[in-house]
């Protein structure tokens, strides 16, 4: 019969196995295991080859929750179907970037967009209006319609740095889109992290973020955070299970290490904490 000490050690080893860790360290924060609904990492694929996707998934799959095929890259990607099938072979949810959705909408090809997703077996879809103006009721109607075909993510915020949205409006838009059927709302930042919830310098608009969190559940927001300092801010504010997006593929292990206090920037976050 196992003593309590041995039982706890066995449980720790089992947890390591489930979370794809290689050895035991005490005082490591608990990451929600996959498949998870919060603590998500969304990767932005801006043009990986099929071989690079294989290599990336071989190390990244345990730590990645969703992959976005960035902006309109899907239109010009060679062997797109085969590339998508590689991701799908790892049971990895993928979706076309919101800019591609907008490209279909502005050309009055919304039904073609639905067919595109169906043809490629895509069951995650992003609705955004960062490049074009869509009346918000119409945007919410798109969200509701797409829920018939899969999981919808909707992006709030403009790609135009001169278009400043006040905090109350961010909250209003996010609430309406969640009510329309979005599973998550994405806080816009672009791949550079210099618009939307950030200033042009990349600095977080802290007042905006904290006001949003007074009304919108943290587990329903994916914060685009391509820069390390931005990721660190949200880890400090919300914790290791914050949803982060627009992460570069080659940063996945670095981010996961920082989430759990194994990078210099977050080294002391969880020591002496259970």
Model regions and ranges:
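Hydrophobic faces of well-ordered beta-strands that scaffold small-molecule active sites
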Residues: 38-44, 65-69, 94-98, 125-127, ...
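Conserved anion-binding
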Residues: 123-197
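C-terminal alpha-helical cap/extension of soluble enzyme domains
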Residues: 23-27, 210-274
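Active-site mouth loops of central-metabolism enzymes
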Residues: 39-50, 70-73, 95-108, 156-169
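Conserved N-terminal beta1-alpha1 strand-loop-helix module at the mouth
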Residues: 19-86
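Active-site-adjacent beta->alpha loops and helix N-cap segments on the catalytic face
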Residues: 74-86, 104-111, 131-150, 164, ...
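Acidic (Asp/Glu)-rich catalytic clusters
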Residues: 54-62, 78-91, 112-120, 141-149, ...
């Amino acid at each position: 019969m196992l003593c309590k000490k041995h039982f706890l050690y066995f449980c720790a080893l089992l947890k390591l196995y489930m979370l794809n860790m290689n050895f035991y360290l005490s005082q490591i924060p608990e990451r929600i295991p996959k498949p998870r609904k919060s603590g998500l990492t969304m990767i932005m694929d801006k043009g990986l080859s099929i071989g690079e996707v294989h290599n990336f998934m071989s190390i990244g799959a345990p730590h990645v929750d969703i992959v976005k095929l960035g902006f309109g890259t899907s239109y010009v990607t060679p062997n797109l179907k085969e590339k998508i099938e590689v991701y799908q072979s790892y049971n990895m949810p993928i979706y076309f970037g919101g800019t591609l959705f907008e490209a279909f909408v502005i050309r009055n090809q919304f039904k073609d967009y639905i067919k595109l997703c169906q043809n490629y077996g895509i069951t995650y879809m992003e609705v955004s209006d960062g490049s074009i103006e869509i009346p918000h009721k119409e945007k919410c109607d798109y969200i509701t319609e797409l829920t018939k075909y899969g999981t919808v993510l909707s992006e709030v915020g403009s790609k135009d740095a001169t278009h400043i949205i006040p905090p109350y409006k961010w909250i209003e838009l996010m609430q309406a889109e969640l009510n329309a059927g979005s599973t998550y709302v994405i806080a816009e930042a672009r791949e550079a992290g210099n618009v939307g919830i950030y200033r042009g310098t990349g600095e977080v608009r802290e007042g905006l973020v904290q006001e949003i969190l007074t009304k919108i559940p943290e587990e329903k927001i994916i914060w685009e955070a391509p820069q390390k300092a931005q990721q660190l801010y949200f880890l400090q504010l919300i914790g290791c299970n914050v949803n982060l997006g627009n992460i570069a593929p080659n940063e996945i292990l670095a981010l996961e290490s920082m989430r759990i206090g194994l990078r210099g920037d977050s080294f002391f976050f969880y020591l002496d904490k259970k």
